[in-house]
Amino acid sequence: CGVSRSSATAEDLPQASFAGQQETFLNVSGERALIDACRRCFASLFTDRAISYRETQGFDHMEVALSIGVQHMVRSDLAGSGVMFSIDTETGFPDVAVISAAWGLGETVVQGAVDPDKYLIFKPLLEEERYAPIIECTLGAKERKMIYATGGSTRTATVETTQKERELFVLDEAEILELARWAVTIERHYGKPMDMEWAKDGETGK
């Protein structure tokens, strides 16, 4: 199965993020389902929400283009996923990476529908083996998770997490540091602070 992911020209801009304005479809299987998902991605340029946002931000509706990325979908529904920033978005402090993590597919974290775990990492110490660069680990409630749906027309389902899942951190120390190093690498490549999404494959452990 795969994911049909929208990517518009007016996204993640300094003055307007356009976060969540276009649609992404998860757990898509088969050619017909993929074509349908792509059509719906294109059509999401003209939802009430997207039109209203462009009007508010002063963007010409006819000047916004959209492409679609079709990706292999890893089984993060069997593990965890989330988002990370190469800067502290609340304070603007540039020397930390901030990682959010929850069980299941990352859509719950992106949409703000779940209280995720949060990790704060001091970037300058990532290459210093003598020091521990993890500043803080905060356990989130993680009361629900999004998983693959079985049968029917719905591709995903949101279910309650177990008590054990709520009490455990999604990431261990090695995984936190690996993600933080990727955040630094990506930030260096683009030459500016970046926000990223990540997912762990529950079948391969990667």
Roles of regions detected by a PLM:
Residues C1-K206:
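Conserved mixed alpha/beta core segments that line enzyme active sites in large multi-domain catalysts
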